[in-house]
Amino acid sequence: MSESAAQEIPMSRRQLLSFVTGGAIAATTAATLYPVVLYFLPPSTAGGGEGVAAKDKEGKDISVSKLLAAATPGEPVLTLGLDVNGGDATYIVINDQKEIANFGINAVCTHLGCVVPWDNGAKQFKCPCHGSVYNADGGLERGPAPQPLALVKATVSDDKVLIAPWTEQDFRCTDLWCNKDPYWVK
């Protein structure tokens, strides 16, 4: 040990408390900012560029085998998925053969952004905010919504449902809306 190191003055109590307080503030700030930063980052994709894995209400990946075992044919299942049209609530469509359809439906109303629940009795999506009605494919049946619910592409890979942007033509056509170009693709 050199003689200059032995002559250094040890840290004072005030310096130690300042150091500990600064560390506590830095740790608290980092813990607070971590979820904020994650919010602005794009969601991780499952399986390369194939899409985002659909999640349940707890944020866990949905197992296709468990989903189909519990699903009712013709009744869509609400999941968390791709942020389309300002919201990531997405319906996975279960067809009559009890298979996952190749498309899903974004659950955000095109009028004012309310999440649209499925009415199983009427076999329609009905917006609770202002009464817009959408058919089982998300096609617009009654306004004030100006457009149908946005579509997403749904594929199955490794027992997961992958949701990706729908870029193909819109296959739905109703009396209120019949535009083949997907309005949600920018």
From Swiss-Prot:
Alphabetic keyword roster: 2Fe-2S, Cell inner membrane, Cell membrane, Disulfide bond, Electron transport, Iron, Iron-sulfur, Membrane, Metal-binding, Translocase, Transmembrane, Transmembrane helix, Transport
UniProt-listed Enzyme Commission number(s): 7.1.1.6
Q: Which residues form the Rieske domain?
A: 74-163
Cross-referenced Gene3D superfamilies, in alphabetical order? Rieske [2Fe-2S] iron-sulphur domain, Single helix bin
What cystine linkages occur within this chain? C114-C129
A single Gene Ontology CC annotation of this entry is: plasma membrane
On subunit structure and binding partners, the annotation says:
The 4 large subunits of the cytochrome b6-f complex are cytochrome b6, subunit IV (17 kDa polypeptide, PetD), cytochrome f and the Rieske protein, while the 4 small subunits are PetG, PetL, PetM and PetN. The complex functions as a dimer.
Spell out the protein name for this chain: Cytochrome b6-f complex iron-sulfur subunit
**Which gene is transcribed and translated to give this protein?**
petC
